């Protein structure tokens, strides 16, 4: 037990040490999703705000290292806050074209900007991928952009995912 604590302390100490040449993070495009949405359900106001639940009905995704479909059955849990912003938290699964299933939990905040128009929406997806070809998803930080998908996609959103380097 003492050895484990010492190893943990040494690891934390290494993180705290200043880096010789710290680089600013950059973004690298990972993939784009078109996420189909179903009819929203509004269970009502809670102590935290107005809740809205939107089913994820399917979709597609594609990028340089990954491609596949979005598995129907996920949900987007939204919470309208007193300040006019909406917290979004989507939990769903990707299925790659070679059959690998990957969990996504994607959170963000939608807030009105000047004149009531919405500001660009940024998200922070977290992936749980099995070990192997796609474990890079579990081993990196990501950010996303969220917007309505083109009308030909039906009720859907477009999410562009970027790996933080």
Feature locations, PLM:
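Bacterial N-terminal signal peptides
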Residues: 5-16
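Beta-strand-enriched cores of mature, soluble protein domains
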Residues: 21-165
